[in-house]
Structure formats: structure tokens, C-alpha cells
């Protein structure tokens, strides 16, 4: 295993490619992640802020979010397969993605999940607003959180529904973060002791895990965002 970029009592950050690092990891109770969406690849026309990482943030000079669609599907299936192998028998993956319009049809995130991995539920993240310059389809204002779960996985609540109305956050360090409150809800409604985010970005998953008293591992390809996440996670948990 590589030396951590940053580590404290709750959080460990690794700088590198998740496909290379995942085989060294195990005993993960929950994966919470949001990969690049490939919005510039093969004619995708999805509106909204999106995840055009190279255009919106200089932390990803080698990734323009424009892979050929078949290559992108193969990559994401490989990542999800590697994540599945890190889980405990009661573990689960919360995989944040979105429907994308490519050509004349919508591409659903379900195609990115290997056939042997059971998608138990689709949680709708209602962002409240969106943006679209294309009149061939309506303004997209929601994303998906796929719950991909081992048979023994259970939530710790019976009161949380499958539509999460959480406004997206603007003006952060990363071009496409999900809100801290979304990460807090996902982690807080499980009893997972160890959380993993293989596309860590600015460290939202890790910050939420630390605030909830859980341990977390983050993997990030960009050294710039490793540093941003490390500074964010180095802050002590505030007493409420």
C-alpha cells in the first residue's frame, strides 16, 4: 500500500488511481462516491452544472470528461467491481450519477453497474434547480444515488424516504461537489464504521464521516484536491 498523503485518527487520504489502490483495501462498510460523469463524451448533451472537470477546475489537467462511451462504461464497471470486493458482508455502495442524453436517447447509470452487482434501490437526489441550453429535452434537476448492496446490508432507520431534496452547493473548491448534507444523510442512515470514497475530490465524504465519528478513506488522482481535502479534514469536529 502507498504511504498516505494525509492521515489522522479518523481520515486517511491516498493520492493515486483508485483502480491501483482498491485491491489493497478491505473491511469497508460503505462506499459513497460520485465519479466524473463523462458529460463531454460521445455527444452527451446533459444540461446543468455537470462534471466538466478540466474546464471548470485546473486540478484535472489530464481528464477532460470526454472518454468514448464504451471505454467509460468499461472503466466504471471495473471501478465498481473493485469497490464491491472491498465491502464487508453487510456493506453497500452509494453511487451518485445521473441520466445523460447522448444523441437521441437517455443513458441511464444502471448500464455502468456490472450484472452481478444487485442494485437494491434508486434514491432520487432532487437538487431543486438546473440549467439547460438544449430545447430537445426538459431541464434536468435531479440525480440518482444507486444503492448497490450486499444481502446483509441494512439501514438504521425506517423514516427516510427515497427522494432527497437537497440543494446543490455553489462556489466550492471542486468543480462538481455533492453537498455535505447529502453525504451526512447517506452515512448517518447506516451503521457503517469505515467509509470509502475512491473519487474523493475536495473531501466531502470524508468530512461528513469525521463529523459523524466514523473512519474514512479517500482516494484522489489530483494532488491539488488531496491538499484541499487534507486541510478540510484537519479541522476538528465542532461540538453541537
Which residues does each predicted region cover?
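Core catalytic lobe of class I
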Residues: 2-227
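Short, conserved SAM-binding/catalytic segment
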Residues: 4-8, 230-240
